[in-house]
Amino acid sequence: MTSQPDPRDDEANPLGVRLRERRRQLGLTLKEVAVGAGLSVGFISQIERGITAPSLSSLVSVARVLNMDVGAFLSQPRAEGGITRHDERPVYAVSPNSLTYERISASFPGNVLRSVIIHEPPGHRSEPIAHEGEEMFYVLDGAVTVEVAGERNVLEAGDSLHFPSTRIHSSWNHTDRPSTILWIGTMDVFGDAPPDGS
């Protein structure tokens, strides 16, 4: 891929600015990026202006349209081996004051599942998105509303929802407490799949 921004430049060059610079470098409009990423034009504009932060899956979708690896915009922990220890997993975020993540899956030849633990603050709403693959939400603590193709599902601790990611979906922590969710999906949210996609 072409020259990629250094994800460590976050403070000097915020995510939105770097995304806008790359979009302009490619001569793409906001609409072209939005359509390609399965997001709204308004949402892409808000990311570029630093008004909102994308979820991990939305950032991956935008990075793909911009012909970049998500690692160009976000430093994520690598998973060495197939085991992660609860007291050793780093917590990371796309931007300050957004969702935080703990990577719990590894990468190896042929793997198709990716998984993270998501810590969602009270009142947080994710943007509606549709993309390839499938995913599952399993609520570990708290509660969250997951909307899939217009159908709202309130999930509490112990509840799960499995659906094709090609259906427009979003989530919302409708409570006044943080929620913790195990997310499992086939989208390469880490950007470390082998080049052939396997």
Stretches found by the model and what they are:
Residues 17-34:
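Short basic helix-loop element that most often maps to the first helix and adjoining turn
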Residues 31, 42, 60:
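Residues within helix-turn-helix
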Residues 38-54:
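Recognition helix of helix-turn-helix/homeodomain-like DNA-binding domains
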Residues 56-112:
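A short, N-terminal "cap"/entry segment at the start of jelly-roll beta-barrel domains
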Residues 90-128, 134, 183-185, 189:
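A short glycine-rich, His/Asp/Glu-containing loop-to-beta-strand
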Residues 99, 165-191:
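Ligand-binding loop in jelly-roll beta-barrel domains
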Residues 132-150:
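Glycine- and acidic-residue-biased ligand/ion/polar-headgroup-sensing regions
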Residues 149-164:
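Short acidic-glycine-tyrosine-enriched beta hairpin
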